Design a protein with these regions (language model features):
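Beta-propeller blade-edge and WD-like acidic-aromatic loop motif
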Residues: 1-20, 29-30, 36-66, 84-85, ...
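Hydrophobic beta-strand positions
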Residues: 10-11, 32, 78, 121, ...
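Conserved loop/turn at the beginning of each blade in beta-propeller domains
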Residues: 24-26, 70-72, 113
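Residue-level detector of Asp-centered blade-edge/turn motifs that repeat once per structural unit
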Residues: 35-36, 81-82, 124-125, 180-181
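Conserved blade-ending motifs and adjacent loop-strand segments that build the rim/top face
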Residues: 73-74, 107-120, 154-177
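Short helix-to-loop capping/linker segments positioned immediately adjacent to catalytic or ligand/cofactor-binding
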Residues: 75-76, 87
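C-terminal terminal-structure detector
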Residues: 178-182, 205-206
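Exposed loop and linker-edge segments at protein-protein interfaces
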Residues: 181-189
């Protein structure tokens, strides 16, 4: 699935043919495709409300509709493994926090993070939700009991990641992902900084290129 601004396209892998699935004059960014194949959730960026989440059904009338359309920003969405829930980031509290809401009842959202958070990721069994702390220096974990209602535990610090690239350059999202078994994490970290490099200035450098005369 790719984007050719400002439209969203799906590519048929067998043929390589791209088909437009969402057309809009506003900038769009794909977030996730539901595991059951029924929904695509994407971010729409407008001057009026900033980034909002929209749902595109892949059956029925196929018309996109707003998952959120508020004065605050919402982004970074991901479907639960059973496709019933969406984890996402919202700034409605005044800072980025992680929330979970039913796919078709986004107003029944529940706040998951307690001290700020970004980049939510579900475990494959849907029983855990991970996210990056507000300072982008730790991965947090919340126990989830999915069902007709959502029961969650309190966030716990899973491990520290030091100064992530997001913390260093001020981006909102830590670059990481979770393995399918939920036991391993791939985290983007800055390369070792060897310190400032020494700069050598060579004057009259053309003279160095002249062949030496035989003595």
């Amino acid at each position: 699935m790719g984007s050719a601004a400002p439209n969203l396209h799906a590519k048929v892998l067998a043929t390589g043919v791209e088909e437009p699935i969402v057309s809009d004059p506003s900038p769009l960014e794909t977030n996730d495709w539901s595991p059951d194949g029924q929904w695509i959730i994407y971010t729409k960026n407008t001057r009026q409300t900033g980034r909002d989440l929209w749902l595109k059904p892949l059956s029925g009338d196929g018309n996109p509709h707003a998952f959120s359309n508020e004065r605050f920003e919402e982004f970074g969405a991901g479907f639960s493994p059973d496709s019933r829930w969406v984890a996402f980031v919202s700034t409605e509290s005044g800072r980025p926090e992680v929330y979970v809401a039913p796919v078709q009842q986004p107003g029944q959202r529940k706040r998951i993070s307690t001290g700020g958070g970004t980049t939510p990721r579900w475990s494959r069994d849907g029983k855990e939700l991970f996210y990056a702390s507000a300072d982008n220096r730790a991965i947090m974990r919340v126990q989830i009991a999915p069902g007709s209602t959502l029961t969650t535990g309190l966030p716990t610090r899973l491990f520290s990641i030091g100064e992530s690239p997001a913390a260093r350059d001020g981006r909102r999202n830590t670059i990481y992902d979770v393995s399918p078994d939920g036991e391993h994490f791939l985290v983007g970290v800055p390369a070792n900084d060897p310190g400032s490099s020494r700069v050598t200035v060579v004057l009259n450098w053309t003279a160095v290129l002249k062949p030496e005369k035989n003595q």
